[in-house]
Swiss-Prot record:
Species annotation: Pseudomonas fluorescens (strain Pf0-1)
Name under which the protein is recorded: 2-C-methyl-D-erythritol 4-phosphate cytidylyltransferase
Lineage: Bacteria, Pseudomonadati, Pseudomonadota, Gammaproteobacteria, Pseudomonadales
Alphabetical keyword list: Isoprene biosynthesis, Nucleotidyltransferase, Transferase
PANTHER family to which the protein is assigned, alphabetical: 2-C-METHYL-D-ERYTHRITOL 4-PHOSPHATE CYTIDYLYLTRANSFERASE, CHLOROPLASTIC
Alphabetized Pfam families for the sequence: IspD
Family as reported in the entry's similarity comment: Belongs to the IspD/TarI cytidylyltransferase family. IspD subfamily.
Keyword Ribosomal protein attributed: no
């Protein structure tokens, strides 16, 4: 651990629609504890003393963002999102470069629908990776028994869970390195599911930092209900 935490930029890709929620609006705009999920996710970073600024990538025709108090927050900059997550993040990185951010600056990319990031986990990630040559991400070791299946849904084998981790966010990398990895992987039409996979594709090995399992990404209705119950029980 280090005495002081490094300064960082935060990027929130929020242009997705979240079809699996079967809701009347993108999942990041659903209500949780009196605010939208997106506002909670933004709030995980906005009051951190090491934050240099935050960029949120939104759908071009997003009708919900202008109605949020966050839309007028001077610490938040908006850019247009892409058709995929990687494009949304890349647009945000291009914006940071245009604003004068340095290639060696740290950037933390966080899911718009992951509203329960703890300050302890954020500080742990910053401290553990401050001097890392690559960067890394919060992750949680797999706990359940894992099965590999064939195309018919039949079990082929049981996977050794001791070497399997679930990738969470934030994911923390240097601005220049992440920009190059994402841009090159898009040109190569590589399958990129998160920032760490782009760095892996570029030949680097991100470091996993164990975080809390309740840093949950809202993907299905039951995820939102679980968070609502948990937050109610805290009061």
């Amino acid at each position: 651990m280090i005495d002081s935490l490094p300064a960082f930029w935060a990027v929130i890709p929020a242009a997705g629609v979240g079809a699996r929620m079967a809701a009347d609006r993108p999942k990041q705009y659903l209500q949780l504890g009196g605010r939208t999920i997106l506002e909670h996710s933004l709030g995980c970073f906005l009051d951190h003393p090491s934050l240099k600024g935050l960029v949120v990538s939104l759908a071009v025709d997003d009708p919900y963002w202008p109605n949020l108090a966050s839309a007028s927050d001077p610490r938040i900059q908006r850019v247009d999102g892409g058709t995929e997550r990687s494009g949304s993040v890349l647009n945000a990185l291009l914006h940071l470069h245009a604003q004068g951010a340095d290639d060696e600056d740290w950037v933390l990319v966080h899911d718009a629908a992951r509203p329960n990031l703890s300050r302890d986990d954020l500080d742990k990630l910053l401290a553990e990776l401050a001097n890392d040559p690559v960067g890394g991400l919060l992750a949680v070791p797999a706990k359940d028994t894992l099965k590999r299946v064939d195309k018919h849904g039949r079990v082929v084998e049981t996977v050794d869970r001791s070497v399997i981790w679930q990738a969470y966010t934030p994911q923390m990398f240097r601005l220049g390195a992440l920009h190059r990895a994402l841009a090159d992987s898009l040109v190569a039409v590589a399958v990129i599911t998160d920032e760490a996979s782009a760095m892996e594709w570029a030949g680097m090995a991100p470091r996993l930092i164990e975080g809390r399992a309740d840093n949950l990404k809202v993907t299905r209705p039951e995820d939102l209900e679980w968070l609502r119950q948990r937050w109610t029980n805290r009061r």
